[in-house]
Swiss-Prot record:
Homodimer. PROSITE patterns: AA_TRNA_LIGASE_II (PS50862). The gene is aspS. It catalyses: tRNA(Asx) + L-aspartate + ATP = L-aspartyl-tRNA(Asx) + AMP + diphosphate. L-aspartate binds at E176, R220, S364, R368. This is Aspartate--tRNA(Asp/Asn) ligase.
């Protein structure tokens, strides 16, 4: 085996084209497949961008190079220095004839998982051997689209004058008063893993930042075992001052629309590889009220009372009717957290919204309460002690502007963009009730 020494990759596989006929290149990656046929060997090298064929004819290479090629195993790490030779019969209109092959590392055999995708594996097996699973081109395509999604979102926020922030993930109490928190030992105290940056986002509005966003982990100790829930997730959160819930919804529409447009422009190969039925949405999404959603569900035989949260059956009924991306607005105040602003004309209804894709909720937001007295009243009415929120409430005593915001589930949005039916497909190392490794 060789060290990398003075060799450096000159091209990824997708950068080599027939017009480079006669040019010398250095390629590095994994042995995707190997076929040795007497005096001829075919080596398919795979790197991050795809695959490329190296043809090793015994009469055109030295003895050592041919001997190395014949002994290669699947998933060995290799480097090839060779010449591009145009050939209309080759898969991409060219092949590479090696001048030298270096084996940088050997892979054990048999492989516990087949990255070539010729042998199917259950998702639990794939997640157990995730380092091999993510070598698969289709899996890499999912995460390249996810990466472009995050890049696009950051750019949209930056172009809009937002400040990126980082809030604590070790907290002293529940953000929303719930009990679904992971407790941890924090020296002599009890602490929790943060379930939301919500309170900190609002405190920054009191600090005069005007517009902030954060992309970070959240933790929920919910005992779900579904295809759409995880206990550790990435949340894309924003908060804006001197706006209402309609402005927040407009910003969310812009973020989502730009993601679709940027992915279409920058990741066409991944869209094709995943065979996605890609369609950029309209710049504004359909909107229905909670009451209208209830009516749709009831009309489809799903009984739900006004004031109840939407059940899975109700979400499916509404999703079947609406399709695509749409907002549900005007939620019952009792279904929303204490910091959600009720309507002036009817305090049973609040200025909250959910962004749905078919039956899947991908974002939730609202205009927030910015008056101290109302906030204290809401906390008390929900059976919580305002003293537990002392540092948060203090920010509302000395000049808190009207504000609104939302949180968008990055993992769920990636599910939508890549048309996956299990959220675990879109997370490198998912954490759920059963899985804490790798």
């Amino acid at each position: 085996m060789y060290l990398i020494a003075d060799w450096r990759r000159t091209h990824y596989s997708e950068e080599v084209i027939p017009e480079m006929d006669g040019q010398e290149v250095i390629l590095m990656g994994w042995v995707h497949s190997i076929r040795a046929l007497g005096k001829l060997a075919f080596v398919i090298l795979r790197d991050r961008e795809g695959t490329i064929q190296a043809v090793v004819p015994k009469q055109k290479v030295d003895e050592e190079t041919f001997a190395i090629a014949k002994k290669l195993g699947k998933e060995d790490i290799i480097a090839i220095r060779g010449k591009v030779v145009a050939n209309e019969k080759a898969p991409k209109g060219f092949e590479v004839i090696p001048i030298e092959i270096r084996v940088l590392n050997k892979a054990d055999a048999p492989l516990p998982l087949d990255p070539s995708e010729k042998v199917a594996a259950e998702i639990d097996t794939r997640l157990d051997k995730r380092f091999l699973d993510i070598r698969r081109p289709k899996i890499q395509a999912i995460f390249k689209i996810r990466s472009e999604m995050l890049r696009s979102i950051r750019k949209t926020f930056a172009d809009g004058g937002f400040v990126e922030v980082n809030t604590p993930k070790l907290v002293a109490s529940a953000t929303e008063g719930g009990t679904e928190l992971f407790p941890i030992s924090y020296f002599e105290k009890e602490a929790f893993l943060g379930q939301s940056p919500q309170l900190y986002k609002q405190m920054m509005m009191a600090g005069g930042f005007d517009k902030v966003f954060e992309i970070a982990q959240i933790f929920r100790a919910e005992e779900h075992n579904t295809r759409r829930h995880l206990n550790e997730a990435i949340s894309i959160d924003t908060e804006m001052s001197f706006v209402n819930e309609k402005d927040a919804m407009a910003m969310l529409e812009k973020v989502v629309y730009n993601c679709y447009a940027d992915i279409e422009y920058n990741r066409p190969q991944e869209i094709e590889l995943l065979e996605l039925n890609w369609e950029i949405p309209e710049k504004t999404f359909d909107k229905i009220t909670y009451t209208e959603a209830i009516d749709i569900a009831n009309a489809k035989g799903v009984e739900i009372e006004w004031g109840e949260d939407l059940s899975r059956a109700a979400e499916r009924a509404v999703g079947d009717e609406m399709g695509g991306l749409y907002f549900i607005t005007e939620w019952p105040t009792q279904t929303r957290p204490f910091y959600t602003l009720p309507h002036k004309h009817d305090n049973k209804v609040c200025k909250a919204f959910d962004l749905m894709y078919k039956e899947l909720e991908i974002s939730s937001g609202a205009q927030r309460v910015h008056k101290y007295d109302l906030l204290v009243e809401n906390i008390s009415n929900m059976g919580m002690n305002p003293d537990s929120f002392e540092t948060y409430l203090e920010a509302f005593k000395f000049g808190m502007p009207p504000h609104a915001g939302w949180g968008l589930g990055a993992d769920r949005f990636a599910m939508v963009l890549t048309a996956q039916d299990n959220i675990r497909e879109c997370v490198l190392f998912p954490r759920d009730r059963q899985r804490l490794t790798p």
